């Protein structure tokens, strides 16, 4: 995956509702099931399944929908929440597809070029996204898109 795909319309329609954790997990599990079965998929499902394919360590988590919905992922147990992780991949893909904050598409593409891999670049961006979300939540202030973009740009251009 060397380029970012334009999923703008799809993501805007998804942004019009806030899915429950169970709905998010169901979406990922069903997208992965469709991929494995070779069934037709919506573009957003294809994008999700592409990111799941990049994470073989999570394939079992996506294989059993009922278990996925029931399972808890406590922050302190050291196990990453694969659904949160994949949701962050989709969020970053969305940000790039609509270039919001303005300039993120170029910054992520530049970081991917430096890394030689879009997936590795996404993981670096995730660290910034997670930190900025935590900062906003703890301070009670809105998410600072400019600081987020600045962090990505600094990482993309550092020697």
Name what the model sees in each region.
Residues 1-9:
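Single conserved hydrophobic/aromatic residue that forms the stacking wall/gate
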Residues 11-59:
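N-terminal leader/targeting peptides and immediately adjacent processing regions
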Residues 39, 62, 99-103, 133-144:
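Long, hydrophobic, amphipathic alpha-helical segments used as structural scaffolds
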Residues 45-111:
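Aromatic-anchored, charged helix-turn/loop surface patch used as a conserved interaction hotspot
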Residues 123-127:
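Well-ordered alpha/beta subsegment
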Residues 131-134, 138-159:
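Glycine-rich, aromatic-bearing surface loops/beta-hairpins
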């Amino acid at each position: 995956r060397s380029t970012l795909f334009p999923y703008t319309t799809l993501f805007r329609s998804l942004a019009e509702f806030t899915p429950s954790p169970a709905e998010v997990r169901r979406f990922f599990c069903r997208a992965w099931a469709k991929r494995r079965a070779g069934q037709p998929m919506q573009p957003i499902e294809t994008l999700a399944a592409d990111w799941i394919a990049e994470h073989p360590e999570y394939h079992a988590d996506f294989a059993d929908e009922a278990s996925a919905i029931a399972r808890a992922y406590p922050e302190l147990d050291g196990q990453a929440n694969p659904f949160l992780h994949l949701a962050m991949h989709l969020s970053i893909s969305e940000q790039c597809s609509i270039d919001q904050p303005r300039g993120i598409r170029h910054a992520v593409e530049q970081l991917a070029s430096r890394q030689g891999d879009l997936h590795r670049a996404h993981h670096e961006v995730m660290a910034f996204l997670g930190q900025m979300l935590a900062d906003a939540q703890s301070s009670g202030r809105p998410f600072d898109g400019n600081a987020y973009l600045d962090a990505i740009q600094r990482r993309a251009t550092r020697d």
